[in-house]
C-alpha cells in the first residue's frame, strides 16, 4: 500500500512538472506550444500564462493569464488577460514565443502566419517576467519595463492595475467575436459603459474635470482592499470612488470585470464557499443594461433573476429563429394593426436611433406609426411629459416589468381571415316526400338554349372589356407622353426614348444608352426589367426619386413605363462607371488613391442620405461598381437607387464589397475578393491587396481604416454591420473603428471543424 502511494505521488509530481514551469525570468527564444500543455507561472504560483480553451470553442486555443493558486479549484480559475483580446489558433503545433528580437508572437501553424504580436522588436528587450501581481512584462536590460499586459487590458482589471484615460475594456463574447459592450474612461474623469460605440447606458457620475481643463493624467484603479477609485494624479487624491461590500476585509484575490452581459462587477474570492462573489456592480437593475437580452425582452422571474423572452412569437413565422418584430411587407393588402403590450418598454438596437416625438397622445403615436412604412413599433410613456418613441427597425430589445408605465404597440399585418372548416355550416338533409315524372327532352333543350345564351353573353362582355382596356391604355399613354408629373419628373413614351437614343444606337454599358434631350442635354437611358416591380410601384418609386437631391446621387430626369417596357433617364456622367475603369487597365490609371477614397466617402454619404435623411427610408437594393458613375471631375454619383426593396444592412453589405473591389481593382460579385483581402489583412500583408496600378501610391493608415470598416460591413451576422452614418464618420476620420472579427466562413481556423466558424483572429 505504501509503495502504491509513493508511486502515485511520483506520478503527480511528474504531471505537475510537465504542465507547469515556474520561472523567475523568461529568456529570449522561450516558447509555449499548444500540444505540449506547458505554462509560464509567476514566482508565487498565483498566476499562470498558457493556452486554454475559450468557452464553447472546441479545438480552439487562446493564450492568456489566469488565477493559478492552489486554493482556487480549476473550474474557478478565471482568465484575467488574453493576447489579442480573443485571438484563437487551432493546430497543436501553434505556439506563443518570446522571439530573439524581443517580440511576443502568437503563431498559427495552420494558417502559417502570426496572428498577434507585441510589436516590441525595436525596444532591445532582454527578457520577460510574469510578476506576482499577474502582470506580464517585457524588460530592457532586465529592469526597464517596455511593454506590459497591464497596459493592454482585455475585460479585466487586477488590483493596482492602472486604467488611464482613453483606455478601454471590452467584454468577452460567447462566440469569441468582438463584444458589443465596452468600458471607457473619458478625459473628463468619467467612466462610461457603452453598447457598440454610440450608446452610453451607465456613467460614474458628472464630469469631475472641467471641459477647459481636460487632461490625460486621470486614471482608474482597483485597490487590493476592494475599492474602485478615479484618481487625479495632479491632485494626488480620488475624485470618485465606490466600495465593494467586503471593503477592507481580508481577501487575497479580487478583480474587476466587464461581464458578457454588459455589466461591470467587482469580484472577491470567498475562501469559505470557494466561489467568486460579486461585491459590487455598476448597473443595479440588469434589465437596464442596454440590449442585455439582444433582440429579446428582459424581465425578472419570481426568483428575482433576469430572463429573456420573445413577446413577438405569436406574430412571426415559426421558421424564423430570431426574435424580431413582424416584417412589414409592402404588399400587405389587408392593412395593419397595432398590438398593445402593457408595462413594456421597447427600443431599437440595429440601428439604435429611435425617433422621439414629445407632447403627443397615445392615439396619435399609434397613427404616426401606421402612416410610416418604416415604423415597426412604438413605445408611449407619460411620466409628466407625454413621449412617443418610434422604432424604424425589426431589431428591437426591451424591458418588461409591472412597475413600468410604458405601453408599447407593435405593428402587424392583418392577413385575410381564412374560413375554418370546422365552422362551416352543413346543409340540412332534404327529405323527398313525393316523386314526379320528368320530361327528359324538354330538360335537355332548355339547358342547351340557356348555355348558348350564357356563353354568348360572356363573350360579349370579354370583347367589351378588352376594347375598353385598350382604349384606356392608349389614353393613358397619351396622357403620360410628353408630360411632367406633379413632382417635376418627365414621363416619356417608348417612341420618345427611341428618338432620344437614336433607336438605341449608342450603347455605353449593359442596357445603358447615351441619349440627347430636345434641349441638347446629354442623358443616360437605362432599360430595366419590367418583371422587377409592378407598373404602379415603378411609377410611384420614380416619382419619389425625382424629389431627391444630393450631390452624390445622379439626378433622375424622367422615366418611361409603356408597352411592357421601362426606362430610367439619368443625367449623363462623362466618365462612365467605376466598373468601366476597374476592368480597363488604361482607364484604371485615372483612379488615383485619392479618387478611390473620395469615391468610397461619396457613396457612403449618398447611402446615408437615402437611409437616414429622407422623409422615409429608401434602400438602394443593388449597389455595385456598375451603378456608381463618375462625373466630369471624377466625382461619384449613385444611380438605380430607390427601386430595390431591402433592409439597410443589405445595402451596407453591398457597400463593403464595393469598397473592397475599388481598393483592390478586382471585381468579383460572389465575394471571393472580400475573403482573399481578409486573409491578407489578418496575415499582416494588407499592402499586397491594393490595386497594383497605384504603384504603391497610397496612405497606409487610411488603407487600414478603409479595410476595417469594409470588413465590418460584410459581416455574416447582419447585426454587427454598422449604419451608413457610422461608416461616413469612420471614413472621415472622426470615429475610430475597432479591428473586426472574421466576417466570412473562410476565416475559420480549421477546415475540419466547419461548425466552429468565424473565430476572432485580429490584433487589439
Curated annotation (Swiss-Prot):
Positions bearing carbohydrate: 92, 198, 248, 301, 353, 423
SUPFAM superfamilies named among the record's database cross-references: alpha-D-mannose-specific plant lectins, Protein kinase-like (PK-like)
InterPro entries, sorted: Bulb-type_lectin_dom (IPR001480), Bulb-type_lectin_dom_sf (IPR036426), Kinase-like_dom_sf (IPR011009), Pan_app (IPR003609), Prot_kinase_dom (IPR000719), S_locus_glycoprot_dom (IPR000858), Ser-Thr/Tyr_kinase_cat_dom (IPR001245), SRK-like_kinase (IPR024171)
Gene Ontology terms: biological process: recognition of pollen
Broad enzyme group: transferase
Residue ranges, Extracellular side: 25-442
Residues in EGF-like domain copies: 283-320
Domain notes: The protein kinase domain is predicted to be catalytically inactive.
Protein's recorded name: G-type lectin S-receptor-like serine/threonine-protein kinase SD3-1
Encoding gene per record: SD31
